[in-house]
Design a protein with these regions (language model features):
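Acidic, glycine-rich two-metal-ion catalytic cores of nucleic acid-processing enzymes
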Residues: 2-12, 16-19, 25-53, 57-66, ...
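Short glycine-rich phosphate-binding loop at a beta-alpha junction
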Residues: 79-89, 168, 247, 298, ...
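Structural motif corresponding to the C-terminal cap of alpha-helices
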Residues: 153, 176, 368-373
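Polymerase palm active-site segment centered on the conserved acidic dipeptide of motif C
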Residues: 156, 190-193, 393-427
């Protein structure tokens, strides 16, 4: 039986071989290249109950090219498509029938064919690395990867939050960030082909972190910590009319207040604390932060917000110590003692808050994406407590709707806009 699909006759036969549930893996030009830049070289398909899979060739030079659009339509017919990284696959095929295995149980497949090890070491700086590797070796590598993930497939349980998480960050990634000609002056990328395409650079969010809070370092550029002092942010410019940043203020205290059921007299926890202990808001903010991320001082332990917070910290820690884990019910995220050495109550609480922050933000992102879907305005960057939009002036009503999303969730925001990411001014 053949394994390489490069003709219509072979593709027709494959359709009789594959059942309703399959494993899919795209092969990019370079294993580290952002999947938005080019279509994949090949696509691996395997029935999860069968002893081997098939490799459909799109652009590898060792075989005839098959139509990617025909395969894309075929993928819509399956009941379930399992893949190691749904977000990555979505740049090739986006569907409600895809399931992310790594979000369910994270795996790092280190085993490689000898060809992959050899060529990757010698030619990792080549844009077309995977075109150099023989196509049969790509097939063999895909078979290895499938074998690693088969145990995960067998116990996989669908998770709506995982779907939402993957979907919203795929939506952001695919837009890219427009940059000007000064980009290379500030950012010396050794392999620009991994993330640059024409006048755009692409972000890539890592969803498999300890807390579940996405990191955003890609191709040596940390988008979550771009320096503000050296002018490097000026290279990020709009494709439309201006950039708009929506920045959440007092976000973690607000989230914690919602979690513990704290009713703020002023609507601002910093103001509440300042009023009760006779200080200005700036001093109150510093003290609240120190205690949320350190420990609650004895002289302030009777402040209602801190009393409720301390009770939650103790509840989380008690569950963690008694059962060996703490599960966030809304997302299914499990913090296990076996994975988290040297843990303490405050540190675990901070982990949970970072995860809750992400859960809250995914809900916000879903609403924003729904509002601007098919509009010229693009959501281009997310940094924990800030959302950056590339705005078209014609979308005024949509921007108003987006601001209402935050108001409806009782979240305080600051907005700023400008001609580049470095010169944003209060709106």
């Amino acid at each position: 039986m053949f394994w390489l699909v490069e003709t219509q006759e072979q593709f027709d036969k494959v359709q009789f071989e594959l059942g309703p549930e399959i494993f899919v893996l795209p092969i990019q030009r370079h294993p580290e290249m952002h999947p938005s830049i080019y279509a994949p070289l090949c696509l691996y398909l395997r029935d999860v109950t069968q002893p081997k899979g098939f490799l459909v060739n799109y652009f590898h030079p060792e075989a005839l090219q098959f139509d990617p659009l025909q395969v894309k339509e075929y993928l819509r017919t399956f009941k379930k498509i399992y893949t190691p990284d749904k977000k990555a696959l979505s740049h090739t095929y986006f569907g409600t029938n895809t399931y992310d295995l790594n979000l369910f149980e994270h795996k790092e497949v280190k085993k490689q064919t000898h060809a992959h090890s050899y060529f990757s070491q010698r030619y990792h700086t080549e844009e077309d690395l995977n075109l150099i590797i023989p196509i049969v070796k790509h097939f063999e590598q895909c078979e290895i990867i499938f074998d690693e993930y088969l145990p995960v497939i067998k116990k996989y349980i669908p998770n709506e939050y995982h779907d939402d998480l993957s979907n919203v960050f795929w939506f952001i990634e695919r837009n890219g960030l427009k940059v000007n000609s000064a980009f290379e002056r500030y950012f010396d990328l050794k392999r620009p082909f991994l993330s640059r395409y024409n006048s755009y650079t692409f972000t890539q969010y890592n969803l498999n972190t300890t807390t579940g809070r996405p990191s955003n370092t890609f191709n040596s550029l940390n988008f979550a910590a771009l320096p503000k002092e050296n002018g490097s942010r000026s290279v990020f410019v709009p494709r439309n009319d201006f950039l708009l940043e929506i920045d959440l203020t007092a976000y973690h205290p607000t989230l914690i207040g919602q979690m513990v059921g704290y009713n703020s007299p002023t609507g601002d926890i910093y103001e509440d604390f300042a009023a009760e202990y006779g200080m200005d808001r700036t001093e109150a903010k510093g003290l609240v932060f120190k205690q949320l991320y350190g420990h609650i001082f004895d002289q302030y332990k009777d402040f209602e917000f801190f009393k409720l917070t301390q009770k939650l910290i103790e509840q989380i820690w008690s569950t963690f110590m008694k059962t060996g884990k703490y599960t966030v019910e809304q997302t299914g995220k499990v913090f296990k003692q076996s994975d988290l050495p040297n843990m303490n109550p405050q540190k675990l609480f901070n982990y949970v808050i970072q995860h809750w922050e992400t859960y809250s933000n995914v809900a916000i992102l879903k609403e924003i994406i729904y509002i601007i879907n098919n509009k010229e305005t693009k959501l281009v960057l997310y940094t924990y407590d800030a959302f950056l939009l590339d705005v078209n002036k014609q979308d005024k009503e949509e921007i108003k709707q987006i601001l209402t999303v935050f108001k409806d969730k009782n979240l305080q925001i600051k907005t700023s806009y400008g001609p580049d990411y470095n010169t944003l001014q209060p709106l």
